[in-house]
Regions:
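Hydrophobic alpha-helical segments typical of transmembrane helices
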Residues: 20, 29, 44, 59-60
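Classic N-terminal secretory signal peptides
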Residues: 1-19
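Axial heme c-ligation environment in periplasmic c-type cytochrome domains
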Residues: 32, 40-50, 65-93, 98
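Short amphipathic alpha-helix in the helical subdomain of ABC transporter nucleotide-binding domains
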Residues: 56-60, 88
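Sequence/structural segment immediately N-terminal to covalent heme-attachment motifs in c-type
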Residues: 19-35
Length: 100
C-alpha cells in the first residue's frame, strides 16, 4: 500500500506541470483557436511541435507574441501583446514538448 501511494504521489508530481501549462493555455484563450491534437482555427499544438522541432522555446515564444500570417494557412494569428514573456515561454516549452 505504501509503495502504491509513493508511485501515485510521484505520478501526480510529474503530471502537475503539464496540467498547469494546459491550464495557462486555457486561461489565455489559446484553446479557442488551438487544440492539442487537431486543427481548429489554428494548427494543433502537436503540429506546431513538429514544425518547430529543434528550435528553441524562445523562438516559438517570440512567434506567439508577434503573431503572424501565412505560416499555417489564410487565417492570421493576432499578436499576443498582453501575454507576458514568461507565460509565452512557458506555453512554448509546453507546446514543444508535445503539449502533454
Amino acid at each position: 500500500m505504501k509503495q502504491a501511494l509513493l508511485i501515485m504521489a510521484a505520478m501526480t508530481t510529474l503530471a502537475a506541470p503539464a496540467m498547469a501549462d494546459e491550464a495557462l493555455a486555457k486561461a489565455k484563450n489559446c484553446m479557442a483557436c488551438h487544440a492539442v491534437d487537431k486543427k481548429l482555427v489554428g494548427p494543433a499544438y502537436q503540429d506546431v511541435a513538429k514544425k518547430y522541432a529543434g528550435k528553441s522555446a524562445d523562438e516559438l515564444a517570440k512567434s506567439i507574441k508577434a503573431g503572424g500570417s501565412g505560416k499555417w494557412g489564410p487565417v492570421p494569428m493576432p499578436a499576443q501583446t498582453a501575454l507576458s514573456d514568461a507565460d509565452a515561454k512557458t506555453l512554448a516549452t509546453w507546446i514543444l514538448g508535445g503539449a502533454k
